[in-house]
């Protein structure tokens, strides 16, 4: 199973994706769209710079057309953290790292590439041994606090099943958000 990058220089691609975005916004009421373009740029077959320009031009057109929609970029391991890309997005997801003890390295350095209000820092107060599926008994107050502190440097993006939190730990999340 290979990965493919769409050629935004092709009218067919732009028309298809423009219609897809239109449907999401106008028919389904989407006001937040994450553009998870998490593909290594080495997969581009041809002129990388023109492909990139065509993609970013299209993103700019979508932001102009749907000005009330927040478009989030994926940092793709830092490959999409350049100012040319960031100026086309409201928000950039800095990482989907779920290991709370590793995120401080990302959160502490991301501001060298993105503005705090643009840098989405994910907080996973509920996790289960570093995997996506939460379980009871694996949520400590220390883990909750570290996840919230990690997110303070940017725009907090809460994730995971918060209903699994005890009332004490939920209060810590609430305090972190209010802070």
Residue ranges, per PLM feature:
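Glycan-recognition surfaces
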Residues: 1-15, 19, 26, 52-53, ...
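Active-site groove signature of glycoside hydrolases
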Residues: 16-45
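Active/binding-pocket-proximal capping segment
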Residues: 38-41, 77-80, 168-169, 176
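Non-catalytic C-terminal accessory modules of carbohydrate-active enzymes
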Residues: 159-179
């Amino acid at each position: 199973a290979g990965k493919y990058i769409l050629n935004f220089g092709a009218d067919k691609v732009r028309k298809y994706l423009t219609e897809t975005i239109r449907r999401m916004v106008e028919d389904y009421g989407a006001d937040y769209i994450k553009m998870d373009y998490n593909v290594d740029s080495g997969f581009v077959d041809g002129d990388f710079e023109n492909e990139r320009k065509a993609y970013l031009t299209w993103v700019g057109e979508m932001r102009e057309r749907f000005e009330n929609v927040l478009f989030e970029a994926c940092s793709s391991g830092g490959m999409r953290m350049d100012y040319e890309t960031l100026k086309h997005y409201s928000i950039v997801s800095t990482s989907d790292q779920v290991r709370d003890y590793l995120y401080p390295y990302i959160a502490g350095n991301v501001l060298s590439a993105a503005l705090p209000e643009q840098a989405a820092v994910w907080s996973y107060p509920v996790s289960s041994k570093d995997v996506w599926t939460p379980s009871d008994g694996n949520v400590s107050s220390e883990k909750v606090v570290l996840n919230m502190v990690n997110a303070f440097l940017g725009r907090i993006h809460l994730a995971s099943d918060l209903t699994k939190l005890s009332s004490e730990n939920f209060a810590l999340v609430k305090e972190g958000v209010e802070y």
